[in-house]
Regions:
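An alpha-helical support segment within catalytic cores of ATP-dependent transferases
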Residues: 101-151, 155, 159-164, 171
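Helix-rich C-terminal or lid/interface subdomains of diverse kinases
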Residues: 180-182, 188-251
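Conserved short submotifs of the Hanks-type protein kinase catalytic core
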Residues: 63-76
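Conserved HxN/HPN-centered segment at the entrance to the catalytic loop
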Residues: 49-62
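ATP-binding glycine-rich loop module of kinase domains
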Residues: 5-39, 46, 78-80
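Catalytic activation segment of kinase domains across protein kinase-like and atypical kinase folds
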Residues: 157-187
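Internal "kinase-insert"/substrate-recognition segments embedded within catalytic cores
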Residues: 83-112
């Protein structure tokens, strides 16, 4: 992507940097990042738009490694919490309920199929075949549902709109992981991220989602789902903390 020098970097991650330029956000991926994965992310966002879950539009550009996006002029829920906001975890729980209230109707990939494929192709030193078999058993044992699962809905992916007049003044971003399936995996995924990076907030999160979890499954099912999500987390972030979660929850 060729900018004119007026662009401003507003975000960065392992795979891409995000720039603000002429009123739009531009996600610029590393040159070696597969173009077909970027095309999938655009298609995924269009599906989410159609389901009414997020108004942010993605568009292709002349550069296959750059996505043009609507700019969300807001602050992360994480920033609100750091500023002393007291209801952040209640808001995070409400965001999950909103996502799970929508049926995917086959418009996004199936969670069970995606997880099964990922586990079958999984290969990392120290991860045993027994752990993989156990993860596959769990994925197939937890009942399938047709609900949308974001699978990355943590404090940095919930944007507060300062000037919004809506009762729920947030926009949920970063939908590339979204799948159609059982919401218990959505909660388990966030639990793993918090346990890895901020274990001191787990009690706040679990307190906020307690009633929602009770409506879904037993405590054992959540425990099992955490093991699966931890195993898959290793494909993104192969850390000692995540390996410990795998050992604790999958054996």
């Amino acid at each position: 992507m060729i900018f004119d020098g007026t662009e401003k970097i507003i975000g960065h991650g392992a795979q891409a940097e995000v720039y603000l330029w002429k009123g739009f956000a531009y996600k610029v991926f590393r040159p070696d990042y597969p173009a077909e994965w970027i095309a999938f992310e655009i298609d995924q966002q269009k599906a989410v738009n159609a389901l009414g879950l997020c108004p942010v539009r993605y568009e292709k550009t002349e550069d296959a490694h750059t996505i043009k996006m609507d700019f969300v002029d807001g602050i992360m829920l994480e920033e609100r919490l750091n500023g002393g906001y007291k209801d952040g975890f209640a808001d995070l729980a409400a965001a999950h309920r909103f996502v799970h209230s929508v049926e995917a109707a086959g418009t996004i990939p199936n969670l069970r199929e995606s997880f099964t494929s990922a586990i079958n192709s999984f290969s990392l030193p120290g991860i045993t075949d027994a752990q993989k078999r156990r993860a596959l058993e769990i994925v197939n044992a937890i009942p399938e549902e047709k609900r949308v699962c974001h699978l990355d809905l943590h404090l940095q992916n919930l944007m507060f709109l300062k000037d919004s007049k809506d009762a729920f003044p947030y926009v949920i971003i970063d939908w590339v992981n979204a799948r159609e399936g059982n919401p218990i995996f959505d909660y388990a995924r966030v639990f793993v991220i918090f346990k890895e990076f901020a274990p001191f907030i787990i009690d706040f999160f679990m307190g906020a989602i307690k009633d929602d979890l009770n409506k879904l499954q037993s405590k054992d099912a959540f425990h099992d789902a955490v093991g699966v999500c931890a195993l898959l987390r290793l494909t993104e972030h192969n850390s000692d903390a995540v390996r410990q979660i795998v050992k604790e929850y999958l054996g």
